[in-house]
Each structure stands twice: as structure tokens, then as C-alpha cells.
């Protein structure tokens, strides 16, 4: 396990593109370790992929290169040595000063936007296996209560949306977030009550199905399908 540093200055404020680049490096380090560190072209493809991304982006090579330069200056990304092709790897845990579990949650929030603790536990299956939702909530609360001496809070719990039972969490790596917003994104905000309830029930059933697929894949010794 990487031992994080404890920065005495506030965490750097990222642009959405920088957050996408950093989150993609963090994801690929865990999900495709044989291809990591990443070349610029592979990183670009990961940033623009259509699955497991919210919002979808259409970045150019110049966009990614500029973001990498800024992230290198902030000591959050570094170039990998020992290869004829320039490759890049993240230095998130040491640069921000968090442990692996917290880094996983922040990475998913950067890539997929606000999510409930249950959604985060499900979506992090390929990154890190949390024991239960309570453990996810525990790490999120630690990130929310992070002291100023360590760089300040890194997540915020958003207001509950209409027709929903659970609150969503958002990261603060791109600056302050209005905690009164629901953070529902593509979900049920603004829908009639019955429709919102049906959508929430379907989302819950989908989460259960995904968990069942994960277990079956583990028993069969095969890789789970890419989530969308």
C-alpha cells in the first residue's frame, strides 16, 4: 500500500479535463495493469470512451497533453521511464495525501460524476472490493471531514433529489460544489412521483443484477463485462 503524504496546502483545483485525464490514469492502473503506464494515444482513447464516463467528452490530443503538463507541475502525474515511447502514470495518492480506498472513490467520482454510496460500491468492483456500503460511507465521511491541515474536504454530500431515498456524493477536486443541488444528472429529478419511483426501483434492480453477474464471473473465473 502506498503511504500518502500529508499536504499542508489546499488540494489543487482541477479543470474538468484535468480531472478526466487523472481519473482515467487511475482507472487504467487498476483495470488494465498490463498496459499501464499509458501512452498519450491510449490515454486519449480512455478519456473519450463512451462507457463509464459522465459526462462524455471529445478531447483532442492537444487537450490531453496540456492537462498532463499541468498535472505534472502539480506532482499528480509523472512520465514513466524505461520505454522508448513516452508513457504517463498518476501520483494521486501521494500528491493529494489519501489512502487507496479514498483514492478509488475520488477516481470514480471524477470519471462518473455524483453517485450514491451504493452506486460507488458497485462501480468500484474492478478497482477495489469494499466489504459493504457502510465501509464506502465511512471513507466518504472521512474525506468530507478532512481537516484544513491535510488540504481540506475532498467530497460533499448533495441534497436528496425528488423521489429518491439516497443522497449522492460529489468530489471537490474541481472546486466548490453547491451542496443543495441534487446531483441527479441523468436520473429522476423533475419526473412525476410515480415515474421517479419506478425509475429508482429499476435502478435498484439493475444494481442487484450487476452484483449477481459479478459473483457469477468470479465463480467462473472470467472477467466481468464493461459497465455502461
From Swiss-Prot:
Disulfide bonds: none annotated. Pfam families: DUF480. SUPFAM superfamilies: Winged helix' DNA-binding domain (SSF46785). Transmembrane segments: none annotated. InterPro entries: DUF480, WH-like_DNA-bd_sf, WH_DNA-bd_sf. It comes from the Bacteria. Belongs to the UPF0502 family. PANTHER family: UPF0502 PROTEIN YCEH (PTHR38768:SF1). HAMAP family: UPF0502. This is UPF0502 protein Rfer_1648. It comes from Albidiferax ferrireducens (strain ATCC BAA-621 / DSM 15236 / T118).
Amino acid at each position: 500500500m502506498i503511504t500518502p503524504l500529508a499536504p499542508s496546502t489546499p488540494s489543487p483545483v482541477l479543470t474538468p479535463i484535468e480531472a478526466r485525464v487523472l481519473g482515467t490514469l487511475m482507472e487504467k492502473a487498476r483495470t488494465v495493469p498490463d498496459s499501464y503506464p499509458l501512452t498519450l494515444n491510449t490515454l486519449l482513447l480512455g478519456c473519450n470512451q463512451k462507457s463509464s464516463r459522465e459526462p462524455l467528452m471529445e478531447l483532442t490530443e492537444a487537450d490531453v497533453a496540456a492537462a498532463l503538463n499541468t498535472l505534472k507541475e502539480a506532482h499528480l502525474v509523472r512520465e514513466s521511464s524505461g520505454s522508448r515511447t513516452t508513457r504517463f502514470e498518476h501520483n494521486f495518492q501521494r500528491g493529494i495525501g489519501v489512502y487507496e480506498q479514498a483514492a478509488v472513490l475520488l477516481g470514480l467520482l471524477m470519471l462518473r460524476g455524483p453517485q450514491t454510496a451504493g452506486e460507488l460500491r458497485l462501480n468500484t468492483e474492478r478497482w477495489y472490493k469494499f466489504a459493504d456500503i457502510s465501509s464506502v460511507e465511512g471513507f466518504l465521511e472521512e474525506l468530507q471531514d478532512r481537516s484544513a491541515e491535510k488540504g481540506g474536504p475532498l467530497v460533499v454530500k448533495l441534497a436528496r433529489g425528488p423521489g429518491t431515498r439516497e443522497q449522492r456524493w460529489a468530489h471537490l477536486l474541481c472546486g466548490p460544489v453547491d451542496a443543495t443541488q441534487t446531483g441527479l444528472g441523468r436520473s429522476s429529478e423533475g419526473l412525476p412521483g410515480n415515474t421517479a419511483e419506478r425509475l429508482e426501483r429499476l435502478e435498484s434492480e439493475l444494481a442487484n443484477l450487476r452484483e449477481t453477474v459479478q459473483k457469477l464471473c468470479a465463480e467462473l473465473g472470467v472477467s466481468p463485462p464493461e459497465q455502461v
